UniProtKB/Swiss-Prot annotation:
PANTHER family: FERRIC-CHELATE REDUCTASE, FERRIC/CUPRIC REDUCTASE TRANSMEMBRANE COMPONENT. It comes from Saccharomyces cerevisiae (strain YJM789). Residues 161-320 form the Ferric oxidoreductase domain. Residues 1-45, 129-167, 216-237, 287-292 are extracellular. This is Ferric/cupric reductase transmembrane component 7.
Length: 620
């Protein structure tokens, strides 16, 4: 029986048998006086204050760069502007920023860290670890963890862990939206702060279990398993907290990298259903204890505000448009494993590096997939998307025989916060379909290059096969024609690295070529010069020769896999440099570490003021 396992305190009081005695009541008051139950709600505020400080510092950084970029003389009206920062303050700022980037731009081994769900960026990792350490210290340093008897009140460790978990729920939901106020304040798009959403969820789960375990342990310590069973039967299951922690564990399991990788579409649909169940059950569990439900009230207000803003500005409820108005996209296969989607006329303003979510109106209508967009050269005013066939939606799209698809567009999202016009040198580094992110920067800023601070734009694109270049053949031809002199002057440099040389004659007839090296591929020196594609028939050769004379020296095609670290170190670094990369994990790993190393030039060379990196990927 329970009485046989009744904890006796040093003063002789029994935690179970004496629960109604006057001495028990007096000891309970003393315990509450030493560690007030009501004070534990302050720990939720401590977590909120810490996150608010991080957001505030990030906001200051964003505003500082906005002011710094706007003070640059990249427009005639900015010449000799009195708002230009003082030289002394500018030097201090650039050195501090370079030191920060020297550390934060570095990358951990992608394969290991991504598999474990750990941030690969050193900067992101440090923020996550600082938040984790802060919350752990605030939870476990204060004592006592337990009260002498459970009847004296809930274990202090449980209460403060629970209130800390609830305070984190607000940030978990706020960080989950494609449009979110935190991302707007700190100047980061949702896909970049999604890692903070994931880790806030992990911390919330951890503190939820810290909240649960002391209750179970103290009940067992005082009266054994029978006491635990008795307290379980006496509580309302829906009120007990079991449903919310069950939902939270299911959310965590379904969000593991391995689950997202293999069951991404199931994860997307399951995620929001579990989140709704978690929120409702948690509200029922905590109301009205310590006013903690107010965190959840604030959460739902912010979340719905973000959702309605997204639907009205980016989504299907835009003013002046029909509800969920669809559009037609042309579908075509442009190479092995690659699909091209072109929307001829788009009523949407977008910037280089942004992406949209595409939903096809067919059996895949529940699926919503992100794709980078860039202007179509074939259809002025239209947008183009390159989609690599992998699994799920992209594979079905590639294998379909449809020439057109009716789609819903949600977006645009993402992009770069900095003003590209304030830099002197822009380096675009990409692999595969990552060209979708980098090419629009060249398309937009190439024609206005001399109206800005920009001096050089360099594009380095790594592809597997030579025929992959046909993905953007129209766009490259248009740029070569319109900006021919800039190409010849070396103001615009385009290099394409072909890792596996597999010429397809039919693809290259109209592609602008640069030098006659196809006849002597064994000459190593020729590989570093402009390379052309060969033709087998006389008519094609004649066409090619004319094209070659017109575009000679414009595009460099190198039939070898590049050492990107060496490529970046060989750049002629300018005064203010912007690196934009998009592509594989290995590419972003190399570029991140290389640009981190370039920060040393800011200290050693007075002619180098900034090396800024913007990397793009859909890693969520």
């Amino acid at each position: 029986m329970i009485e046989e396992r009744d904890l006796v305190l040093s003063n002789g009081i029994h935690c179970i048998a004496d629960i109604h005695s006057e001495l028990y009541a007096r000891l309970k008051k003393e315990s509450q006086a030493v560690t007030p139950w009501v004070y534990q709600k302050q720990y939720g505020k401590f977590v909120t204050y810490f996150v608010a400080v991080i957001i505030f510092l990030s906001l200051i950084k964003k505003l500082a760069f906005m002011y710094y970029d706007s003070s640059e003389e990249f427009l005639p009206e900015k010449k000799n502007s009195p708002t230009t920062p003082s030289v002394f303050l500018a030097r201090i700022m650039t050195k501090l920023v370079a030191f920060n980037r020297y550390i934060c731009y570095r990358k951990f081994p992608t394969l290991i860290f991504s598999y474990l769900g750990i941030p690969t960026s050193v900067g992101t990792f440090l923020v996550v670890m600082a938040t984790t350490l802060y919350t752990l210290l605030y939870c476990f340093v204060p004592h006592p963890f337990y009260r002498p008897c459970a009847g004296f009140g809930s274990p202090p460790l449980s209460v403060r862990a629970g209130i800390m978990a609830i305070s984190l729920v607000s940030f978990v939901f706020s960080l989950s939206g494609k449009i979110n106020v935190i991302g707007w304040l700190v100047g980061l798009s949702y896909e970049k702060i999604n890692i903070y959403h994931q880790w806030a969820s992990i911390l919330c789960l951890f503190f939820s279990w810290v909240h649960v375990i002391p209750f179970l342990r103290q009940a067992r310590h005082e009266g054994g398993y029978e006491r635990m069973h008795q307290r379980w039967k006496a509580s309302d299951m829906w009120r007990s907290g079991v449903p919310p922690i069950l939902f939270l564990n299911l959310l965590w399991l379904s969000s593991l990298p391995i689950a997202r990788r293999h069951f991404y579409e199931i994860f997307l649909q399951l995620h929001w259903i579990l989140a709704v169940g978690f929120y409702i059950s948690l509200f029922y569990h905590v109301y009205p204890e310590l006013n903690s439900h107010m965190y959840l009230v604030a959460t739902i207000v912010v979340w719905f505000a973000q959702l309605f803003y997204r639907l009205a500005v980016k989504g299907y409820l835009r003013p002046g448009r029909s509800f969920m108005a669809s559009t037609i996209a042309n579908v075509s296969i442009v190479g092995e494993g690659c699909v091209e989607l072109i929307v001829k006329d788009v009523d949407m303003a977008y910037s280089p590096g942004q992406h949209i979510f595409v939903r096809t109106i067919d059996k895949d209508i529940i699926s919503n997939h992100p794709f980078s967009i860039f202007p179509s050269a074939k259809y002025p005013g239209g947008i183009k998307m390159l989609i690599r066939a992998q699994k799920g939606f992209s594979k079905r799209l590639y294998e379909s025989n449809d020439d057109m698809k009716k789609i819903l567009i949600d977006g645009p999202y993402g992009g770069i916060e900095r003003d590209i016009r304030s830099f002197t040198n822009v380096y675009l580094i990409c692999s595969g379909s990552g060209i979708s992110t980098c090419l629009p920067f060249l398309q937009k800023y190439g024609p206005i290059l001399h109206k800005t601070n920009l001096e050089v734009i360099t594009l380095d694109w790594v592809v597997r096969h030579r025929e992959d270049i046909s993905w953007i053949r129209d766009e490259i031809c248009t740029l070569s024609n319109n900006l021919r002199q800039l190409f010849l002057d070396g103001t615009i440099v385009v290099r394409i690295y072909v890792c596996s040389d597999s010429t397809v004659p039919g693809i290259i007839k109209t592609f602008p070529q640069t030098a006659d090296t196809a006849s002597d591929q064994s000459d190593l020196a020729k590989r570093e010069k402009d390379t052309e594609f060969g033709q087998d028939d006389t008519e094609s050769n004649s066409t090619f020769d004319k094209s070659n004379n017109e575009y000679k020296g414009l595009i460099t095609i190198i039939p070898s896999k590049p050492d990107l670290n060496q490529v970046i170190n060989d750049y002629q670094i300018g005064f203010r440099n912007c690196f934009i990369c998009s592509g594989s994990d290995s590419l972003r790993y190399t570029v991140g570490n290389s640009v981190a190393g370039l920060q040393a030039k800011v200290f050693s060379n007075k002619n180098v003021e900034e090396c800024y990196l913007h990397s793009e990927s859909f890693g969520y």
